Each structure stands twice: as C-alpha cells, then as structure tokens.
C-alpha cells in the first residue's frame, strides 16, 4: 500500500463513528473488534483512525542499571510512519506509565494519529493540548524506564481480549475503540459508510416529523440496506 493509499484510508475511517464500524463488522459476520475497558484521556478529544503499529512491553527482567529498555523514542523514530496509530500492550501493568507528553509530541510530529494502550499514561493535560488522541487504562505519574522493557515491535498483541495485528485499522472516538482486520478494511468501510449515510437520512426524516419506523423504511429505500 502506498503512502497516499494509507492516508486515504485514515481519512475515510476518521470520518466514521465507531458505532457504524462496529455495526458493519457485525453485519458482515466478522469477529467483534471492540476494545472494552479503556478510556480517552480527554473526553472531548477528536476521532482518530490509523494503522496499528504494535509494541509489546513487560516488566523489566533485570534491575535498573541506568539503561532504558522501554525504548519508546527509538520505536517512534525508527518504526513509525504517517498514518500509524501506536498500540502498546503492557499486559495490564498500571502502576507506571508507558509514556507521556514528550513521546506523544514526537509521535504526532511523525504523523502518528494517536495512541492506544492497556497501560497508563502521564502528562495527559499536555497530551490533550497537543491534540493527540489517546486511550488508556488510566493515568500514573511514574515513568516506565525503571520498570518496563520493550520485547517486541510489529508483533501480534492482545488488548482487553482483542487480538491486534500490525496493520489493522484502529478507530477511536468518544464512544470507544474498534479494530478492523487489515484484510477487511475496504469491505468494512463500504458497509460502514453506507450505514452512516442511511442514518443521516433517518435523522433528516425524523426532523421532518416522521416516526422512527417510517424514517428507517424511507432511509433504507433511499440508501439501501
């Protein structure tokens, strides 16, 4: 996929509510990809979409010796590209943060669209001020350098029971997070965009004074199922 194609899909999915994407996946008979139990750092943050750039982390296997094994900066500088969305699996570790404002700013300047982690973040006011959407398990003031090491990049990870592969499409908004398998990106988009258009017509008919049943029937006739 070219850089232009990647950004095309990012822009298309950034225009879709997660509810429409989830409904499309249900309608296509795909395994549900909703990541439950994580929360936006800013309730007013914008919708974001991007290709999963996965990072697997765990507790350090050696005591702190002055060497930072988390390697966040190196991962961002060496691995990310425009249209990515950082997905960091910490296996539920929540007593330290996996990142803060400096890493978020560097990622944003690299064209990364946002961050998703089952760990914690810090400096969330600054991250929100950067307009960098992020979902996490919570917040923690302590940094990761003393406690965490990165053991894999661009590897399969599981967040809250959902398997995420490198290159999957991640969609995040104030409702939640949905993961679209990389091989189904086009198919899910076509269905989700049709659902979105149909709902727009339902709203228009409701504002005209029609009942919900009438509005749904009219919208289905206009847009299709």
Identify the meaning behind each predicted range.
Residues 176-178:
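Channel- or pocket-lining gating/hinge segments that regulate access to a cavity or pore
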Residues 170:
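C-terminal binding/interaction regions
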């Amino acid at each position: 996929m070219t850089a232009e194609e990647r950004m095309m899909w990012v822009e298309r999915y950034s225009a879709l509510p997660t509810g429409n994407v989830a409904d499309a996946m249900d309608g296509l008979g795909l395994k549900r990809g909703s990541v439950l139990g994580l929360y936006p750092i800013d309730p007013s943050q914008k919708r974001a979409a991007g290709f999963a750039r996965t990072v697997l982390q765990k507790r350090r296997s050696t005591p702190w010796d002055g060497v930072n094994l988390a390697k966040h900066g190196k991962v961002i500088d060496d691995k990310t590209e425009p249209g990515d969305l950082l997905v960091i699996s910490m296996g539920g570790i929540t007593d330290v943060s996996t990142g803060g404002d400096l890493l978020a700013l560097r990622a944003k300047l690299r064209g990364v669209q946002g961050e998703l982690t089952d760990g914690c973040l810090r400096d969330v006011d600054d991250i929100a001020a950067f307009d960098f959407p992020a979902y996490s398990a919570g917040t923690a003031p302590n940094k990761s350098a003393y406690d965490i090491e990165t053991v894999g990049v661009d590897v399969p990870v599981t967040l809250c029971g959902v398997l995420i592969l490198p290159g999957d499409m991640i969609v995040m908004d104030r409702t939640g997070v949905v993961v679209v398998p990389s091989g189904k990106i086009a198919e899910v988009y076509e269905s989700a965009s049709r659902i979105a258009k149909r709902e727009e017509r339902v709203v228009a008919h409701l504002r005209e004074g029609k009942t919900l049943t009438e509005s749904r029937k009219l919208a289905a006739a206009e847009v299709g199922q």
